[in-house]
Amino acid sequence: MAASRSELLRPAFGEPSPSLGPFVVNPHTCSYRWWQKFLIVLVLYTAWASPFELAMEKSASAALAVTELVVDAFFAVDIAVSFFVAYRDASTGLLVTDRKKIATRHLARPCLALDVASTIPLQMIYRIVSGKRQALYGLLNLLRLWRLRRVSKLFARLEKDIRFSYLWTRLIKLLYVTLFAVHFASCIYLWMAFHHKAKELTWIGSQFHGFEDRSVWFCYTCAVYWSITTLATVGYGDLHAANTGEMLFSIAFMLFNMGLTSYIIGNITNLVVHETTNTFKMRDMVQRTSVFGRTNRLPVAMREQMMESLQLRFRAEEQLQQEMLSELPKAVRSGIAQHMFRGAVQSCYLFQGVSDKLVLPLVAEMKAESFPPKADIILENEASTDCYIIVSGEVEVLTTLEDGTEKQVMRIGPRGMAGEIGVMFNIPQPFTIRSRKLTQLVRISHSHMVSTIRPNTADGVVVFSNFVLYLESLKVKAKETAFVRDHLRNGYSTVLGSATMFDVDESKESAHKMLPCKEPKRVSIHEHLLNGTGTALNGSSGKLVILPDSMQDLMKLSEKKFGKAARGILTVGGAEVEDIEVIRDGDHLFFSW
């Protein structure tokens, strides 16, 4: 992708998106980014060639001079292009696309002068004009190293790019800095030796007579050897400073090495600590859990469960996941939850056939959890605060017999539910739920489930109908297992006993009864229309009754109150009522005979 999401053109609040004018370059386009990457390659060449050319003047050739001119030309083009590149205002964070503002800002930058100076081939111009070399102009060529700031910006971007390893990016950066320091010091040592009047009074001349006639790579190898031994502070003594200038430079170089070494050691220490932080956290938590178990004399099996759950939590990084999600906007969290949990909800028996109006808010507050093998998810007789949808793995449903032993009732696999019986009936959990293998579940809280179903009456009917059918299937299974039937009859007769009172054909009516009821509507029913005084034509003032749930029940109520069957129901304005839902609290209803 050409630009990251956060780098797109962002308008001011309430204003239309900015558009790039003619001859204005978007700094986030793919072509401009590739141009910057190409310049990075040229910067790396400059970082090696400029000091080397300074030290090895005898290695200068026409090919090297042409290469330098071509490289300088590319950077000159970049300076010209930068007058047309939009920039992001630091105070507002908006992209400025006005060409006058871009040019004014670029001209006001102090680094423009250094950019231009580093592009001008001063030594070559002096040589063409005077016909000879000058050491001072050779040193001015080191202004090209100003381009190294591009490499620094590159590493700063790579460290923030999650596609690249932060550890390896930092290590490569440290290696690059070290190699450049060694190369630069080596070239300075050679430059000082070649330009000293008494060649034998130099660090290399005292060991190798006539070194100026040796090959370029021999001299460079000796310089790198001395530079790196100085950097590493080993100093074998075979090479050493032989004049005052070399001594002063060696002092400055060793002072620089002290700072560089501290920087490298500090960075590597920070990287190592960062990589092992989670391990230290886990070890500390495991140790505290172990001490807690021993102090409270918990059974060995319970301690093992605690350890397994703790280790699984760190491996799955559940805590980190929840912390990350909590920092996101609610709409983003909801979208993530839809992607992760919607399939599990729709495949579960309890929510089959419900609309998105129920699924969307239900999924928004779900949480994923993982349990190791043989971990207790729900305990028998505990409060019904949550139920679970099994995404992967398998759990077993257990009941405790009178002698205290546990007996398996059934196994539940993926797309099954656990703990919903206690939640639906609002009773203590009738069974113990224990994982048989590594199990991933989605947790739904009791309060959230009730608050989501309550306003969605039609979907609530579907949910309770599915639950009734599930209870009917439990009755069949319970007949095959006497101890389960006895257990439910003795302790929680409402669980399967409720299934008996729910006929499948009457599940909708039963579901209506189980749904939280709204405030009843009170209406006045009249046998005849009202006259001008507010009383019925036959003198009756009507009857105040509770509005039934259906039109049929309302008709039966009128027949019971007035002794005859009505053909229709009218409002005060004479409109015929066709749906019970349109009748409001306090309405006057009139029956047509």
UniProtKB/Swiss-Prot annotation:
Q: Which GO terms describe its cellular component?
A: monoatomic ion channel complex
Q: Where do the annotations place a nucleoside 3',5'-cyclic phosphate binding?
A: 350-470
Return the Pfam families for the record: cNMP_binding, Ion_trans, KHA
Name the predominant localization.
membrane
As for family, the record states:
Belongs to the potassium channel family. Plant (TC 1.A.1.4) subfamily.
**Function description:** Probable inward-rectifying potassium channel. Assuming opened or closed conformations in response to the voltage difference across the membrane, the channel is activated by hyperpolarization.
What is the protein named? Answer: Potassium channel KAT6
Q: Which organism is this entry from? A: Oryza sativa subsp. japonica (Rice)
